[in-house]
Swiss-Prot record:
Family affiliation: Belongs to the universal ribosomal protein uL30 family.
GO process annotations (BP): translation
Pfam families linked to this entry: Ribosomal_L30
Molecular function terms from GO: structural constituent of ribosome
Listed name of the protein: Large ribosomal subunit protein uL30
């Protein structure tokens, strides 16, 4: 197997919308991203699964930084 010599890419997201009155699936997605309160910021690995979770709640989060 080939070793991954690249540095791990990260993506920083901030919660800008409230999960109140949102479907349970969207609330669970925010929890999966490590976000549960307004204006919380998390730095996550930049993987396809994380990108998909961000896309599912794009109206509730903002991408702050990509490295």
């Amino acid at each position: 197997m080939a070793k991954n010599t690249e540095a791990q890419k990260t993506i920083t997201v901030e919660q800008i919308g409230s999960p109140i009155r949102r479907p349970a699936v969207q609330r669970q997605t925010l929890i999966g991203l490590g976000l549960n309160k307004m204006h919380r910021v998390r730095t996550l690995e930049d993987t396809p699964s994380v990108r998909g979770m961000i896309r599912a709640v794009q109206h509730l989060v903002r991408v702050v930084d990509e490295k």
